[in-house]
From Swiss-Prot:
It comes from Rickettsia conorii (strain ATCC VR-613 / Malish 7). DNA-dependent RNA polymerase catalyzes the transcription of DNA into RNA using the four ribonucleoside triphosphates as substrates. GO terms for molecular function: DNA binding; DNA-directed RNA polymerase activity; protein dimerization activity. One of its GO terms (biological process) is DNA-templated transcription. CDD domains: RNAP_alpha_NTD. It catalyses: RNA(n) + a ribonucleoside 5'-triphosphate = RNA(n+1) + diphosphate. It is an enzyme of class 2 (transferase). Homodimer. The RNAP catalytic core consists of 2 alpha, 1 beta, 1 beta' and 1 omega subunit. When a sigma factor is associated with the core the holoenzyme is formed, which can initiate transcription. The N-terminal domain is essential for RNAP assembly and basal transcription, whereas the C-terminal domain is involved in interaction with transcriptional regulators and with upstream promoter elements. This is DNA-directed RNA polymerase subunit alpha. One of its GO terms (cellular component) is DNA-directed RNA polymerase complex. Residues 251-340 are annotated as: Alpha C-terminal domain (alpha-CTD).
């Protein structure tokens, strides 16, 4: 019977996730994942994007209360904007909550002034992430008082679908955007593994409002997908699939990996092939001097390989006991899941 684990263990797995923040802010990041099987870049990119934009928990203002104002079609004395415009501006306030329970914030201002989100009294449990955000213009000698209710939730909740069924008279429900992720885009490019150049590289650009960092948002989205997909695994692995046979080797199974699977330049790969260096174990037993005596192998190729080996705590001139093993091809195939 075909081993079930062959369905996933024979696929190439991403071994590199790079996060790069933009210099002007920590709220934007470029995330690069590689290598992926061809087609998996689009599959994972689309799934991650949808989860990032819909399913993460965040905080938002869900209702406001202004003295003597009972609905959004009113006007506020001394305020240039009507209540509908004020509500629209309040929807743009980005908040972060440190507790799960709702909190009521207060705003008091005296004109003339431009009322901003930074004037809101939040207490210790809530932060305003965009304090310069404009709420309204207040005329001279006029006062504005307001209570704003802040809650934790997910997605986009319309005021008409608010879970606050019985708001007190004078309290106005507003649309709430809880999601801390503001935008997600992605693209897929080719990447190279060994001599194969058409694997996928997934590049995502994620921007948040500062409630969570992009790296954390991506991790949360991946965990959500993992939890949702777990139910579909309706079989048990065979015992042979569960066994990890690593107790008989006197060296790291990574040394059984073929050098043509490394991301080497064509020149370096050809030099190793011509010198009959097939496995990483063959490679690390050579000294730097040995390598520089290889025809057409120069200092640039040496530094390229040293950099790759260093990622796995390997180096030239290593003492590898019992290398090469007699059944090296069989061992390489058996342990391929350990080093991929």
């Amino acid at each position: 019977m075909l081993s079930l684990s062959k369905n996933w263990n024979t696929l190439i797995k991403p071994n590199k996730v790079a996060y790069e923040n933009f210099p002007e802010t920590n709220n934007k990041a470029k995330i690069v994942v590689e290598p992926l099987e061809r087609g998996f870049g689009l599959t994972l990119g689309n799934a991650m994007r949808r989860v990032l934009l819909s399913s993460l928990q965040g905080a938002a203002i869900t209702s406001i209360k202004i003295p003597a104002i009972e609905h959004e079609f009113s006007s506020i004395p001394g305020v240039k904007e009507d209540v509908s415009e004020v509500i629209l501006n309040i929807k743009g306030i980005e908040v972060k909550m440190h507790v799960a329970e709702k909190r009521i914030m207060k705003l008091k201002a005296t004109g003339p002034c431009v009322v901003t989100a930074g004037m809101i009294e939040t207490g210790h449990d809530v932060e305003i992430l965009n304090p310069d955000h404009v709420i309204c213009d207040l005329a001279k000698d006029k006062q504005l008082e307001m209570e704003l209710t802040c809650k934790v939730g997910k997605g986009y909740v319309l005021s008409t679908n608010s879970y606050e069924d019985n708001l007190p008279i004078g309290e106005i429900a507003i649309d709430a955007l809880f999601n801390p992720v503001k935008s997600v885009t992605y693209k897929v490019e080719n990447t190279r593994v060994g001599q194969v150049t058409d694997y996928d590289k997934l590049i995502m650009f994620v921007e948040t409002n500062g409630d969570v960092l992009p790296e954390m948002a991506v991790g949360l989205a991946a965990r959500i997908l993992q939890e949702q997909l777990q139910l579909f695994i309706s079989f048990e692995e065979q015992e042979e699939d569960k066994q990890v046979k690593t107790d008989t080797l006197p060296f790291s199974p990574y040394l059984l990996k073929r050098v043509d699977e490394l991301e080497l330049s064509v020149r370096s790969a050809n030099c190793l092939k011509n010198d009959n260096i097939i496995y990483i174990g063959d490679l690390v037993k050579r000294t730097e001097s040995d390598m520089l005596r290889t025809p057409n192998f120069g200092r640039k190729s040496l530094n390229e390989i040293k950099e790759i080996l260093a990622k796995f705590n390997l180096r030239f001139g290593m003492d590898v006991p019992d290398w090469p093993p007699e059944n090296i091809q069989e061992l390489s195939k058996r342990y391929e899941d350990s080093y991929n």
